[in-house]
UniProtKB/Swiss-Prot annotation:
Illness association: Mucopolysaccharidosis 6: A form of mucopolysaccharidosis, a group of lysosomal storage diseases characterized by defective degradation of glycosaminoglycans, resulting in their excessive accumulation and secretion. The diseases are progressive and often display a wide spectrum of clinical severity. MPS6 is an autosomal recessive form characterized by intracellular accumulation of dermatan sulfate. Clinical features can include abnormal growth, short stature, stiff joints, skeletal malformations, corneal clouding, hepatosplenomegaly, and cardiac abnormalities.
Sequence positions that bind substrate: 145, 242, 318
SUPFAM superfamilies: Alkaline phosphatase-like (SSF53649)
Name under which the protein is recorded: Arylsulfatase B
Binding positions (Ca(2+)): 53-54, 91, 300-301
Top-level division of the source organism's lineage: Eukaryota
Record field: catalytic activity: Hydrolysis of the 4-sulfate groups of the N-acetyl-D-galactosamine 4-sulfate units of chondroitin sulfate and dermatan sulfate
EC code: 3.1.6.12
Protein family per UniProt: Belongs to the sulfatase family.
Purpose: Removes sulfate groups from chondroitin-4-sulfate (C4S) and regulates its degradation. Involved in the regulation of cell adhesion, cell migration and invasion in colonic epithelium. In the central nervous system, is a regulator of neurite outgrowth and neuronal plasticity, acting through the control of sulfate glycosaminoglycans and neurocan levels.
Length: 533
C-alpha cells in the first residue's frame, strides 16, 4: 500500500495492532523451534552416500555371510534394507548412472568401463548430481574412487560439481603405494604410476598408508569441520573391496578358518570396510549431524568370485547380467525415515538416487537431460509402491566377456530372432530387461555359473546345463531369484513384449563410445596418471 493509502488508515488501534501481542510470540516460537520440529520447518537433510566396490550379495552379515559386518548389520537393521535393489554389473556404468540419473545407453558408456588410456569421460553436457545439489545450497565433497574419466581437466570431479575431492581417478590401484600399472598397447610398455589427488593436485606423502583408512580419516575430518546449519553432501566411494587383495595382517586372523586364500584376504578387507562405516557414522553422531542425515550404503556391482567375492545363492558375478552381477547390496539409515527396521521389496535402481536426493535437498532437476531414474523416497521411507515398474539392465552390442566361466562353457551364439514371435530384437545381442517380476536376458549374459561360498561346500562352482547356443531366457525373479527355471517357452507373449521393449530402448540409444587407447596418456615423464589433453 502506498503513502496515500497509509494516510487514510484510522488513527485508533486497528485490527492489525490488536493482533501483534498474539502473533509475535507465535513467530518467536517458530523461529526458535529445533530443526525437524514441524512440517516444512526443518532444514534440508545432510546426504551421505557410501559406495563400496565389488561387494557381493553374500559378503555381508545381514545376508547370512560368515564375514562379520556388525556396523553394516546394525545400520541395515535399524533402517530400510533394500532387497530388490539393482546396480550395473561394472564400476563405470554404475557410477555414471548414480551421478547422471540416466541409463548408460544414453551416454555411450554401455560397453565395459573407462580404461586408463582412453580419451573418454561422462559426457560434459551431462549435469551431475553434485552440480544439482550445489544449486540447492549444498556443500559437496567427494572422497575415493572416481573412475568416470580424466583425460581432460574438464572431466575431473572438481569440474563436475564437487567443492573438494580426495582420492584416485582410475578404476583400481595398490592399496598402499597408490600406484596403477597399465599396459599401453601402442607403446608396448607397461607403465606404473601414482594415482592420488587432493583437489586437482597430486597427493604425495601417503605411501604405505592403507587407502580405506586414509579415505575414512578424510571423510571424518570433513564431517567434523562441517557447520551443521549448512547442508552437506558427502560421496564416499571406497576402494574396498576391489582387488588387489590387500589388508593389514590383524584383519586376517579372525578368518583363519577360511582356507581359500582369496576369500581369506577378502573377508579381512570387508571387516576393515565395515569398521570404516562405523567410524564415519560415529563421526556424524558426535558432530551433531546424524539426526538430520540420510545415510545410503550401496555396492557398485556384484562380487567378483575370481577375487574373493561371493554372490551365493544368486547366479553369476561381476561383468554379468545375471542377478549375481546386478543385484545390489544396499540400505538407507536415517532418523528421518518414517518406517525403520524393515525390508523393502520394491524395485529400485541406482539411477533413482539422483532424483530422490535432489528432491530431498529441495532442489530441482532443471538443466538435466531426460532422466531414467525416479524419486523413490516415499517408497523407501513410507513403504509406498515404487514408481519404477521397468528397468533396463543394459544393451551392449559389442560385449566381450572379460570374466569368462571356468572352461568357458558358453559363448555368443547366432541370432534367434528369425523366429516370427521374436522378431522385435536381435537376441544375439548382450542385453537384459526387467518388467515387474519378469526378467529377460538375451545373447551371452556373462558367466552363468552359481558359485557357492569357498570352504563351505565341496564344489567351487555349479555349471549351468544351458546349451552354448542358447540366447534367450525368461525368469520370474520374485519366485526364482536364483534364475534356475527358464520360462521363455511357457510365456512366449511375455518374451515378445519384453523383446519389443528392448528394441525400443535400442532404437533410442546413442552409439557405443569406446575409443582406442591414446599413447599420450603415458605417465613416464611425470610418474603420475592424470589429464593429457
Amino acid at each position: 500500500m502506498g503513502p496515500r493509502g497509509a494516510a487514510s488508515l484510522p488513527r485508533g488501534p486497528g485490527p492489525r495492532r490488536l493482533l501483534l501481542p498474539v502473533v509475535l510470540p507465535l513467530l518467536l516460537l517458530l523461529l526458535l523451534a529445533p530443526p525437524g520440529s514441524g512440517a516444512g520447518a526443518s532444514r534440508p537433510p545432510h546426504l551421505v552416500f557410501l559406495l563400496a566396490d565389488d561387494l557381493g550379495w553374500n559378503d555381508v552379515g545381514f545376508h547370512g555371510s560368515r564375514i562379520r559386518t556388525p556396523h553394516l548389520d546394525a545400520l541395515a537393521a535399524g533402517g530400510v534394507l533394500l532387497d530388490n535393489y539393482y546396480t550395473q554389473p561394472l564400476c563405470t556404468p554404475s557410477r555414471s548412472q548414480l551421478l547422471t540419473g540416466r541409463y548408460q545407453i544414453r551416454t555411450g558408456l554401455q560397453h565395459q568401463i573407462i580404461w586408463p588410456c582412453q580419451p573418454s569421460c561422462v559426457p560434459l553436457d551431462e549435469k551431475l548430481l553434485p552440480q544439482l545439489l550445489k544449486e540447492a545450497g549444498y556443500t559437496t565433497h567427494m572422497v575415493g574412487k572416481w573412475h568416470l574419466g580424466m583425460y581432460r581437466k574438464e572431466c575431473l570431479p572438481t569440474r563436475r560439481g564437487f567443492d573438494t575431492y580426495f582420492g584416485y581417478l582410475l578404476g583400481s590401484e595398490d592399496y598402499y603405494s597408490h600406484e596403477r600399472c597399465t599396459l599401453i598397447d601402442a607403446l608396448n610398455v607397461t607403465r606404473c604410476a601414482l594415482d592420488f589427488r587432493d583437489g586437482e593436485e597430486v597427493a604425495t606423502g601417503y605411501k604405505n598408508m592403507y587407502s580405506t583408512n586414509i579415505f575414512t580419516k578424510r571423510a571424518i575430518a570433513l564431517i567434523t569441520n562441517h557447520p551443521p546449519e549448512k547442508p552437506l553432501f558427502l560421496y564416499l566411494a571406497l576402494q574396498s573391496v576391489h582387488e588387489p587383495l590387500q589388508v593389514p595382517e590383524e584383519y586376517l586372523k579372525p578368518y583363519d578358518f577360511i582356507q581359500d586364500k582369496n576369500r581369506h584376504h577378502y573377508a579381512g578387507m570387508v571387516s576393515l570396510m565395515d569398521e570404516a562405516v562405523g567410524n564415519v557414522t560415529a563421526a556424524l553422531k558426535s558432530s551433531g549431524l546424524w539426526n538430520n542425515t540420510v545415510f545410503i550404503f550401496s555396492t557398485d556391482n556384484g562380487g567378483q568370485t575370481l577375487a574373493g567375492g561371493n554372490n551365493w545363492p544368486l547366479r553369476g558375478r561381476k561383468w554379468s547380467l545375471w542377478e549375481g552381477g546386478v543385484r545390489g547390496v544396499g540400505f538407507v539409515a536415517s532418523p528421518l525415515l518414517k518406517q525403520k527396521g524393515v525390508k523393502n521389496r520394491e524395485l529400485i535402481h541406482i539411477s533413482d538416487w539422483l532424483p530422490t536426493l535432489v528432491k530431498l535437498a529441495r532442489g530441482h532437476t532443471n538443466g538435466t537431460k531426460p532422466l531414467d531414474g525416479f524419486d523413490v523416497w516415499k517408497t523407501i521411507s513410507e513403504g509406498s509402491p515404487s514408481p519404477r515398474i521397468e528397468l533396463l539392465h543394459n544393451i551392449d552390442p559389442n560385449f566381450v566377456d572379460s570374466s569368462p566361466c571356468p572352461r568357458n562353457s558358453m559363448a555368443p551364439a547366432k541370432d534367434d530372432s528369425s523366429l516370427p514371435e521374436y522378431s522385435a530384437f536381435n537376441t544375439s545381442v548382450h542385453a537384459a530387461i526387467r518388467h515387474g517380476n519378469w526378467k529377460l536376458l538375451t545373447g551371452y549374459p556373462g558367466c552363468g555359473y552359481w558359485f557357492p561360498p569357498p570352504s563351505q561346500y565341496n564344489v567351487s562352482e555349479i555349471p549351468s546345463s544351458d546349451p552354448p547356443t542358447k540366447t534367450l531366457w525368461l525368469f520370474d525373479i520374485d519366485r526364482d531369484p536364483e534364475e534356475r527355471h527358464d520360462l521363455s517357452r511357457e510365456y512366449p507373449h511375455i518374451v515378445t513384449k519384453l523383446l519389443s521393449r528392448l528394441q525400443f530402448y535400442h532404437k533410442h540409444s546413442v552409439p557405443v563410445y569406446f575409443p582406442a587407447q591414446d599413447p599420450r596418456c603415458d605417465p613416464k615423464a611425470t610418474g603420475v596418471w592424470g589429464p593429457w589433453m
